[in-house]
Amino acid sequence: MKMTLIAILTCAAVLVLHTTAAEELEAESQLMEVGMPDTELEAVDEERLFECSVSCEIEREGNKDCKKKKCKGGWKCKFNMCVKV
């Protein structure tokens, strides 16, 4: 009886671990399919940095203090530019 219980619990634990690993692999493969190539991500990063610094320069030329622009999507404002966090 004791051995049967141990065998059932062991099989259940293996099944749970296997299912979790399979779900992680499936999620990773979906991210890889949906994600942008690295070159496109670099272009987006450069574009955001440029937009933030240009908008800050425009505010300065208007004799206003440069307001920290709220950056979104993993970015923060630092030194009047959007910086990837």
UniProtKB/Swiss-Prot annotation:
Expressed by the venom gland. Keywords: Disulfide bond, Neurotoxin, Postsynaptic neurotoxin, Secreted, Signal, Toxin. Residues 1-22 form the signal peptide. GO terms for cellular component: extracellular region; host cell postsynaptic membrane. Residues 23-48 form a propeptide. Disulfide bonds join C52-C66, C56-C77, C71-C82. GO terms for molecular function: toxin activity. InterPro entries: Hwtx-2-like. It is found in: Secreted. This is U4-theraphotoxin-Hhn1y.
